[in-house]
Amino acid sequence: MANPIKIGIGGPVGAGKTQLIEKVVKRLSKEMSIGVITNDIYTKEDEKILVNSGVLPESRIIGVETGGCPHTAIREDASMNFAAIDELLERHDDIELIFIESGGDNLAATFSPELVDFSIYIIDVAQGEKIPRKGGQGMIKSDFFVINKTDLAPYVGASLEQMAEDTKVFRGKRPFTFTNLKTDEGLDEVIDWIERDTLLKGLS
């Protein structure tokens, strides 16, 4: 496929970006051809995690070492990621969907619209109930927003209801969901959004 759909996955370190990609790819790869690009600062650890998970053959996963400023590689100078896309398509010219995982960064990180067609931003409840109120650009501008690790809410004193209300304030009608990716809670909502809002748009 000459022009696959590209979805960026952003969020802070430990929020669940790699796990989200693993879970989504495991489901969608049964129906379509997928590739993944991971961005890490000085290692290719996320690439190794995905390879070891077995959700895709190693040739369909490319790790990019971004150096000290990971958000630059997905926005101001995305040349390494564009090169990785080209390499994926040389390896597998049938790829229909590519996930690009950003290096863990702050709440302001966003993807260049030239690099991705859609973006998902993920945070986790353990970062605190107040995180949605901070309204970082990654959360505000992403096409889909995920609040992960709902099981930790009682342990950190976070109200999921309050987080939902705060999210609606800064996102308006843009979609979001809660997840517990350890148990796949909320995963269907993410899959449904991808199939409905990205894959159909790409085919229209």
From Swiss-Prot:
Residues reported to bind GTP: G11, P12, V13, G14, A15, G16, K17, T18
Gene3D superfamilies per record: P-loop containing nucleotide triphosphate hydrolases (3.40.50.300)
A GO biological-process term: urea catabolic process
Main location group: cytoplasm
Gene Ontology CC terms: cytoplasm
Pfam families linked: cobW
InterPro entries: CobW/HypB/UreG_nucleotide-bd, P-loop_NTPase, UreG
SUPFAM superfamilies: P-loop containing nucleoside triphosphate hydrolases
Compartments reported by the entry: Cytoplasm
Self-association state and partner proteins as the record states: Homodimer. UreD, UreF and UreG form a complex that acts as a GTP-hydrolysis-dependent molecular chaperone, activating the urease apoprotein by helping to assemble the nickel containing metallocenter of UreC. The UreE protein probably delivers the nickel.
Function: Facilitates the functional incorporation of the urease nickel metallocenter. This process requires GTP hydrolysis, probably effectuated by UreG.
Family: Belongs to the SIMIBI class G3E GTPase family. UreG subfamily.
Name assigned to this protein: Urease accessory protein UreG
Organism: Staphylococcus aureus (strain NCTC 8325 / PS 47)
Protein encoded by which gene: ureG
